[in-house]
């Protein structure tokens, strides 16, 4: 038996901000240095990033210092598939998917779903924890309000480390803080940006072909994909 965890949010920046953040494994030890990820090793070190184009999009590999690689998948044009970290040591790693959908040039919505590997008493505890988290969040200022306060310098994200939605707030700050439509001309990309560079090259190639009336790549979804935790 498994449980399903679903969620959605709006982020006030171009949807490419979130697309790129999602495939950037190196952002985790920085943006989420203080988060639930620490318990399960996702932010313990900075991985070496490699990526390759596939029939479905991009496969990303983040190899840790111990030689173990975390494998994520980006399915063109807007799907991310990863192993999501558990919220409890008694849960397995989740099969997590996110669809990023533009609303307009300066905002987008993410639709998220995860298969949670729990059964029996663990499933009951999962449902109760979800209920309590939703109840707690409903009584707090919204994630958008807290992110805006952090970006304005009125508080630090370290002041709100106990919030159940901390990771979402951290991502709001990191992505909206780049600007609704970032100035990419000012960037200095490095080795950890390998997956981002590849994704941009693919989008540039496909959009150029579309503009010139040339055939686009026929992306195909594989029968089976495997994401790994890397820890």
Say what each PLM segment does.
Residues 1-231:
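C-terminal catalytic domain of Rieske-type non-heme iron oxygenases
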